């Protein structure tokens, strides 16, 4: 084993990355954020069931159809998986979600391998640096957890790393390098539109290096690949780039509706997500190098910097937005740090200090990995839907008390439900709401909330004395911790009541 690991230094990091991702897939569950479930899983699964949960498709919209502010490329790939599930299984929604997590975990192993290849190309004499990069990408911090969920910001990482690899394979880009870089950047942009900033930021680098043919080649290849990935727009809408235009239009007018922050918000995010004290060393290593850096170094660092500057200037500052470039930042950051450290007389005299800093990092990282692997996001909402699936429910109602968080209907096995948001619909008394359900009575009513949950339940029970209490599903301990760290993440209980003959129907 030792001999094999020495000859194949990528073997052990890949194995560790695989095991940690399988653990995160098997022992975790739920979803991390709104978008990874509702804009991916919920949409794709509903299409496979002959529904259109998010009303993305123009033939299901009333009036003038309007493009949803997302794209079909990645969601379409998940739709094909759900169609495959119908042929081969599994059939239970939770089992399907598990398979999705495993597949995403396997897919993310490419990031580890490509980080190693990029490091080998940028620092060919430092094989230990490339191995260290692979270990960081495989087994540190939140990467095992993030790698198994359906975030587009993570799905675009392997092709983006492929693009960077193509850019650093040689100082004078050859046609093979141009194809690899262009296809990688094009696919990444097709999955996550903002990755196009990488391509834009690459232009001045190649111009400065006078690589005219490479600039044209990468540009044409990337645009061609991206255009092919937008082909579903022609099928669905009858014209190209509809989703892209819808995405730009939505974000130009609704950006202020989302979390904001100062211009240095993402610097703080990087310091946290990379985990101290390594985060300080990696950021210094990535951006301190001067004229001594090789030309292919700037083909990675400048696009990363451009991507970060773009998002720092943008008003909507959600932490996940910068995830696409973080693995590349780790790669060049570690190379730059090792290069600077080896040239520093001060660090030559303080080798033990650096060893202590990295030991501290790995202790913190191991704790983060251990805490995050069993993460089951939005536990109460998911388990409530799984309860309905076990009851073979056809129609249900959700009364949202303290938040407008939608129920993850995918786990219920049905797409027929009624949503009442008490925060915005307070003018409708419970009796009137219940009467509106008579045409298709829900079998269960789910009350979702926290502080005012008991009050809302009491109001509905007074209007419908026949409601029968079934169970209460509490949030997970992890959900409570996340809420405590950042209250913007809602935490709710779900109380389930059977309607039976409780509705005021004639």
Where do the language-model regions lie?
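Specific aromatic-rich, kink-prone transmembrane helix
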Residues: 114-117, 136, 143, 155-172, ...
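Signature aromatic-anchored transmembrane alpha helix within multi-pass, membrane-resident enzymes
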Residues: 10-18, 223, 227, 289-293, ...
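Catalytic lumenal/periplasmic loop and adjoining terminal transmembrane helix
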Residues: 30, 234, 346-496, 500-503
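Hydrophobic, aromatic-rich transmembrane alpha-helices
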Residues: 117, 269-295
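Transmembrane-helix motifs of polytopic, lipid-linked glycan transferases
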Residues: 98, 102-125, 162
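Perimembrane helix-loop-helix junctions
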Residues: 2, 164-185, 196-230, 283-292, ...
């Amino acid at each position: 084993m030792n001999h094999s690991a020495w000859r194949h230094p990528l073997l052990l990091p890949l194995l560790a990355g695989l095991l940690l991702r399988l653990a995160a897939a098997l022992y975790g569950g739920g979803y991390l954020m709104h978008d990874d479930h509702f804009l991916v899983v919920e949409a794709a699964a509903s299409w496979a069931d002959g529904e259109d949960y998010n009303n993305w498709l123009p033939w299901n919209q009333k009036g003038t159809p309007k493009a949803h502010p997302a794209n079909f490329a990645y969601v379409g790939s998940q739709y094909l998986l759900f169609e495959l599930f119908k042929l081969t299984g599994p059939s239970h929604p939770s089992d399907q979600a598990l398979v999705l997590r495993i597949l995403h975990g396997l897919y993310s192993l490419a990031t580890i391998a490509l980080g190693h290849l990029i490091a080998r190309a940028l620092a060919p004499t430092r094989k230990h640096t490339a191995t260290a990069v692979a270990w960081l990408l495989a087994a540190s911090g939140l990467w095992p957890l993030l790698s198994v969920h359906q975030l587009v910001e993570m799905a675009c990482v392997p092709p983006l790393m492929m693009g960077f690899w193509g850019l650093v394979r040689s100082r004078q880009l050859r046609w093979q390098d141009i194809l690899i870089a262009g296809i990688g950047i094009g696919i990444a942009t097709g999955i996550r539109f903002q990755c196009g900033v990488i391509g834009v930021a690459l232009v001045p680098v190649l111009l400065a290096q006078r690589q005219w043919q490479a600039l044209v080649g990468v540009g044409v290849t990337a645009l061609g690949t991206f255009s092919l990935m937008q082909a579903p727009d022609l099928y669905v809408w009858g014209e190209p780039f509809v989703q892209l235009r819808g995405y730009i239009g939505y974000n130009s007018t609704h950006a202020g509706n989302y979390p904001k922050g100062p211009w240095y918000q993402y610097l703080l995010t990087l310091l946290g997500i990379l985990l101290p004290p390594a985060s300080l060393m990696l950021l210094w290593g990535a951006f301190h190098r001067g004229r001594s850096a090789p030309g292919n170094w700037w083909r990675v660092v400048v696009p990363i910097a451009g991507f970060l500057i773009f998002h720092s200037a943008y008003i909507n500052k959600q932490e996940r937005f910068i995830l696409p470039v973080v693995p590349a930042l780790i790669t060049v950051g570690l190379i730059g740090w090792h290069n600077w450290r080896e040239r520093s007389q001060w660090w030559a005299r303080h080798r033990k200090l650096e060893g202590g800093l990295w030991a501290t990092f790995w202790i913190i990282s191991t704790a983060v990995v251990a805490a995050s692997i069993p993460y089951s996001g939005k536990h109460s909402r998911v388990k409530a839907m799984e309860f309905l699936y076990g009851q073979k429910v056809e129609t249900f109602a959700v009364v949202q008390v303290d938040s407008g968080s939608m129920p993850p209907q995918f786990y219920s096995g049905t797409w027929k439900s009624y949503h009442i948001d008490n925060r915005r619909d307070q003018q409708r008394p419970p009796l009137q709401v219940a009467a509106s359900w008579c045409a298709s009575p829900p079998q269960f009513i789910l009350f979702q909330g926290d502080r005012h949950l008991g009050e809302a339940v009491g109001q509905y029970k007074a209007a419908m004395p026949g409601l029968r209490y079934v169970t209460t599903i509490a949030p997970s301990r992890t959900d409570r911790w996340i809420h405590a760290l950042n209250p913007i993440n809602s935490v709710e209980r779900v109380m389930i009541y059977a309607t039976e003959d409780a509705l005021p129907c004639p």
